[in-house]
Amino acid sequence: MKALSADSFLARSLAGLTVAVCRHPRWFFWPQAVLFMVCVVYALPRPYGHLDFDMNRDNLVGPDQRYHQNYLRLQKEFTQQDDVVVVVESDNIEKNRQFVERIAAKMQMETNLFRDVFYQQSLVMMGSKALLYASETNLVEMKTMLRAAQPFVRQFTQTTNLVSFFEQINTAFRTAPREANADTKSLIQALPALTRIVTQAIDSLQRPGTPPSPNVIALFDTSGSGVLSNYITFANGRIFLVTTHAPNAETNGPTVDQQHQRGRQTQDEVNGYVIDRLRQLVKQTQAEVPGLNVGITGMPVLDYDELAQSQKDITLASVVSLVLCALIFIYGYNEIGRPVKATICLVVGLAYTLAFTTLTVGHLNILTITFVPMLIGLAIDFGVHLITRYEEELRHGKTEAAALTKAMVFTGQGIFTGALTTAGAFLAMTLTHFKGIQEMGIICGGGLLICFIPMMTLLPVMLLRGRQNVIDHRATEDDTRARIENIWLQRPLLVMGITAGLCLAAFWESRKVHFDYNLIKMQSPSLPSVVFEHKLLDSADKSLLYGAVMVDSLTNAVELREKIKQLPVVADVDPPFYGDFLMDQSKKLELVGQIKQEIASFQFNPADLRPVDIYELSRTLYGLYGYLGNALEEVGNSDPDLTGQLVSLRQAIENLRKVMLQGDAPMVAEHADKLAQFQQALFADLHDTFQLLQHQDDSTPLQVEDLPPALHDRFVGVTGKFLLQIYPNTDVWQRDNQEKFVTALRTVDGNVTGTPVQLYEYETLLKDSYVNAAWYSLAAIALMVLFHFRSLGAVILSLLPVVIGTLWLAGLMGWFSIPINLANIMTLPLVIGIGVTNGIHILNRFAEERTPGILSRSTGKAVLVSGLTAIAGFGSLILAKHRGIYSLGCLMATGIATCMIAGLTFLPALLNLLGRWRPLIKQPSADNSPSTLGQEEPR
């Protein structure tokens, strides 16, 4: 290793820069002050500035990947966005139904935000061909049910409000014969429906908001499963769902938020408006139907929440990192002025970097959003090393200009090389095939070099000002760091042995380290969207994520669907109705015609819009209460089931009368308005349902063109391709399940795509890219160190602390069962780039002075302080609730610490041991010899 020279091109350049700074300080101060302000304004987030946030993971992957091209073709063919899901959970099925009915009604009023709101199998949604989607068996059952319910339904055709309806029921009870006949049987079958109507009327009085209909299908369902079969439910009705999706930003974005008139909105912005508004509607509906566990989830919500949480985490981490680094700097040097000056220069560099990011990349993503606390911990090192050497030279009696020149020329070379090596570790990421990692390399690598500029131009200007310069001309007492360092410098063989033992132990423990691909585990476990995603994963019999296959023809779609359904990893394939378009529908058409005949005579009058006459309704219900009592006496104990139904209806009537009559006159009037809303919902639902049944089209078979818009847009593409949605029967967030599912689907269709495929390839590419980036970083760093020292031995020596520190880190991960994941794998290239700088600075000073003592000199102190600031920078990420960012902070802080310890203990001991055998370099020049001015600080 050759001695460090002041005659190299780099040294002469740094010397010239120092002269310019000393002679023309204003040239370096005011232009940068103006540039700082410009950069801050330019790099403000939109809509105030030009910086965007892109949290779409699909955009992290380059378009040249085949699997991603398949996904882009899918998005181009099927422009509908991913579903946003409202999850309603409780053990009360009726409250769940009430909630989804109410919130769906609110969502359907805001069509500019919520598209294709789906929460039940509605005849209205399916249109005039709705019955042709049902099986022949179901059509026969419907025909039988409608025939049996005719006497009860006719009561509604002859009434317009609740009073007249219950008067009709009273008449039916009063005129019912003792012996059983068709009318009596129909009346008995209507008892559950009557109970449901009365119970729902009570509920409408006790809840705020507009009451929904009791649901016509459930009224006439004799099996008792009408509610569950008519809604989207899981876990036997414990969970109800409402699905919707945001408008497409390319066609509908500008109309989403009328307050923003700044041009076309991104899809992330549109999704944000939808999610925020939906959460407001959830809160409003919870006030109407309390006592439920309600949240929203889905891929857009998970991404949106991840962005919001990451922004909060990074903001907190950045502030904490900046404060900690400044405090460490201040404490380490027992002064405030210079650390504050270095911190100011750091802030200037960060502003430059933000502007650079905005200009070159244009946005931050889920990977690059962490760059600010990273650069805080790394770029402050430039100032630490420069200030430390500057102070040392002042204490050796040099003038301010001479001290600054010595620091800039000699320590500056190490700072420059360290900046290049760390930046090289980042820039090597641009050689990968993962767009998100390439952007990380550009931002962090370029940012480090940019932060180097104010540290080497603005900081020297500020260092030449201040009273601390006078104080530092005084002599200082010997530092205890020299005595501490002698503990291992005088025992190099013992240090070698301990290091080897720790490495062996670490290697043994490192075998326990595994890779965790699960992205859902990286998010904050307390986020509601994550909590409800887990609820669905635990309760659903199939995954919510699906694979996707595009098919050119209907025949091929039906054949491929049947083939895919045979795969053992597949739970279901949607849609189920492709086969209906190809089958013989003559029998179905005949049954639909018969159903229409059954109800052809039904004619419903418009519902009464006036407030309900509470007292008249009470008298009518009291009459029904009496008739039910008579019926109970007639039945006696002969039919327990019928007795139970009569008792339930009688009790419900008694409760309704109590509730609607309680309170003063204004309260009763409010009840009258509420019941009017309820009767309007009930009669409108009946009218719309039977009118739709009467107008079912039985003239022609079902065609693709007959699909309602919500289903047509989902399953038929813009060029006529057909979509198959393939649902796995396992949790495909788990890597093993994911791999089995994707592999199985590719045996059927090599172009299969969808979220599981995207996740599988995304995770694979991300992992491989970071591993490759680590190798690229290692190669680039080795070349730069070789160029700097012109010695292969120096390259090996500078990399030894990195190798040892990384091995210790792996051992600690195995000991504490910490897995590698898709966030903390970034540690691989970063630890190499950051850790090697310690070796460079130590070897730089060793080449200058030919003595292995480092900690007692300014270089050792600077390495220690810069290491602590880097640990603080990355360690601040531990405060994050996002578990991926948290784990990155843990590993980076630990990795930097282990590399620093190895650099400050093992490397000097090794240099001392090697120096005993043979001199490594020539005697330094006279200019670099230790000064003898009075009592000195050890160098």
What is the predicted role of each segment?
Residues 80, 236-238, 421, 541-543, ...:
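Short flexible coil/turn linkers enriched for glycine and charged/polar residues
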Residues 174-335, 629-777, 781:
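Extracytoplasmic
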Residues 120-129, 576-591, 757-763:
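Short proline/glycine- and acidic-rich turn/helix-capping motifs at secondary-structure junctions
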Residues 1-55, 66, 72-73, 249, ...:
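Membrane-embedded transmembrane helical bundles of large multi-pass transporters/channels
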Residues 586-653:
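Charged, amphipathic alpha-helical linkers/stalks
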Residues 44-91, 97, 151-154, 217-231, ...:
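Solvent-exposed, non-transmembrane loop/terminal regulatory segments of multi-pass membrane proteins
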Residues 2-319:
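Membrane-proximal extracytoplasmic
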Residues 128-145, 585-601, 765-775:
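Short, low-order "capping/linker" segments at domain edges
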